[in-house]
Every structure is written in C-alpha cells, then in structure tokens.
Amino acid sequence: MRKSKKILAVTLAAAMLCSVLPASQANAAVKHKGVCSTLKNGVLTISGKGKMPKNMKFRGNTKIKKVIIKKGVTSIPDNAFKSCKKLQSVSIPNTVKSVGSYSFYNTAIENITIPKSVKTIGAGSLCNCKLLTTVTMPGKFKVYAPNPEKNEDIMSRYDNIKSVKLNTILDISNMKYFSAMNVYIWNKDTKYKSYDGVVYSKDGKTVLGMPLKRDELAVREGCTTFDVQAVAYDSVSKDSDTFACGSLRKVIIPESIEKVVDSRNLLSKTKRAEFKVEDIIVKSKKLDGNSIALLSTCFNHIETEKFMKKFSNQIKKEDGMYISNDNVLVKYDGKAKNVVIPSYVKEIADNAFYTANVESVDIPDSVTKFGKNIFELSSIVKVNLPKNMKTISEGMFKNCSNLVDVKIP
C-alpha cells in the first residue's frame, strides 16, 4: 500500500513539473498526457499532445538557444519565448494551428518556418527580431491582436527581413503583413505569381502587391494593368482605413501598361493612404483619363502640375482643368472660383475636384459618366448638374460643408 502511494505521489509530482516548471529548471524529460518541456544544453524541447498551457512561458530566459516543438503540440501561447535573446533556432511541427502574439518577439532567430497548418498568427509575433532575414509561412491566415487598440503587425518594418516565402495560397489582403524586401508565392498557387519578389497575377499581366520594405517599384515589362493595391494596403490599426508603403520613393510604369485600376476601392476610403513617393516615371502612352486620375489620386502628394507633365501627350490643360485625350476631366487645379466645364467633356473622373477651392461648377449635358467622390472636401457652394443625370454618384458631395445649392434640371 505504501509503495502504491509513493508511486502515485511521484507521478503527480512529475505531471506538475511537466506543465508548469520553467525551462531553466526542467532538465529531464517527463512523460505526461499533456504538454511537457525539457531544457538541456540550451535546447528546449516541448512535447506532448494539445495546446501549450498559457502559463508555459519562457520569457526572458537567456539559457535557451534552440526550441524544438514536437509533433502533437497544437498551439504556441502569447509571449511564449518573448525576449529569449539567445534563441537562434526554432522548429515548429505541422500539428501547430496557432502562434500566439509576441511569441518570438525580441529573439535572435535568423530564419523561421511557420507550417502551413497554422491558421492564426498573433500580432507582434516576429517583431524586433533584428537577425531575422527569412520567413517561410502560410499566405492565408488570420491575425490575432490581444489589444485591438494597437496595430496588428506581425513583423516590424524596422527589422531586416529580406524574404517571405509562402507555403500556401495567398490571401492578397495579407500583403499588408509582409514587412520584407521580397515575397515569394507558393508554386502551387493558382491565382498569383512572383516576379523579382513582387506579386502579380498568375499570367503576369497585373501587378498586385509590393513588399512593404521596398523603396522602388519597377513594374515588369509585359504587365498591362497597374492595380492600386500593389502599393496601398488595408489598415492594420484603428487610426486609418488604408496605409501606404512607407519606404516607397520611386515607381516606374513601363510602356506595356494599358490601364490603372483600384480593384478593392482602397482610394475611396475615408482615411486613405498617404504616399511619400518622390518620383514616378511613366513610360506608357496608352493610359486613358480614368487611369491617369487614379494615379493622380494615389500619388496626390506630388504637386498636380508636376505630376500632369508626365502625361504631356495624353492630357491638356484648359482653365485649370486637366482633360485627357478621351475627353475625361481628370483634375481641376485652377484658381478660378467659378468653373464652367467645356461642352466636349464626356466624363468626370474620381476625385476630380478633391479639396479644390471652388465655389460653383457648371456641368454640361455632354457629361454622361461621373466618378466617385468628385467634390470631396472641396469648398463647393453651388453645382449645376446636366439634364441627363439621373442619380448622384457615390460620395459626389462627401464632406462638402459649404454646399447649399444643387441645381437639378
């Protein structure tokens, strides 16, 4: 009887050691139905079945140099290895489904493979890893943020990650999380393909995603469509609707580009991206008025006159209005308070009078198409609409606080 009690006591003690003992003290493997940890000669081995307990954290442990998580473990908790400053190597099995927030924050890992089984990745999980250069990870995942008031970055734009290599199909909205110089698409992805670390459609005809750390985007010759989402991203914080690639300073658009699109309406957001691009080189001579208007909105920090000179063969200026060869009013940048649009204009592009200092605008009957947010944030007071206009376009008078008179024939 005494012998049985002794065995039971030892078993219970081992189980308690396995689940809660810090790695700095656990120097022997202990069998247990849950998840166990063993630290020996700088190698931390985590084994068992199920989730790592929330209290199984090794934060700040400087004895850990390598982490091996065995098959059967299904999750890594928040802050699990945070500030283990000597941790250089991590092995994660394909049974793991979630990686907690700040789990590898401020470690010395140089590369990491997050298996394709992972569906949730915590905010800050790979931030402040100054030696990290290569990340292999899924392209489709959700981000878990323990504090929704803070941003959801999983990598830091201030670190040195050179390449993100995807091991599953890409969810294009996740491009906002890849703070790297290059993103390489999984070779079995049927929708996307990488060229020189930039994401394009599978056929290479549309540029769709630029890695966040690049300072120059040279769109490949042969690409025919420039999608705004290549350089604008959904927000990862509560402070804005979209954000721009903060590193981007130069954009080169080749001769092959025929149109510019905003497939996800990123430029229609209330708090839109603000770019710091210093130079845009446009070699294409095929762009229509709407394409030029989208580029103008996308890079609206560039002085309008300076920007429009890049399209000297495709646009003319008349009374402060930039009008394309296909008769689209692209932008107004004049000083006149009262504007009369010429009778040959057929369309007014998105954001044409955005923030314009105008009081009245006469729109002729020749105009049959109206873009989004035409007068947004302008000082417009009075507008005369054309006879054939049956509906007000989306956001046409958005945030026009001075508007008092809209004449509808």
Where are these regions (language model features)?
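Short N-terminal segments immediately surrounding and downstream of signal-peptide cleavage
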Residues: 31-40
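His/Asp/Glu-rich metal-coordinating catalytic cores
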Residues: 56
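Beta-solenoid repeat scaffold
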Residues: 59-60, 200-203
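Bacterial N-terminal signal peptides that target proteins for export
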Residues: 1-11
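Structural signature of tandem-repeat unit edges
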Residues: 40-51, 62-75, 85-98, 107-120, ...
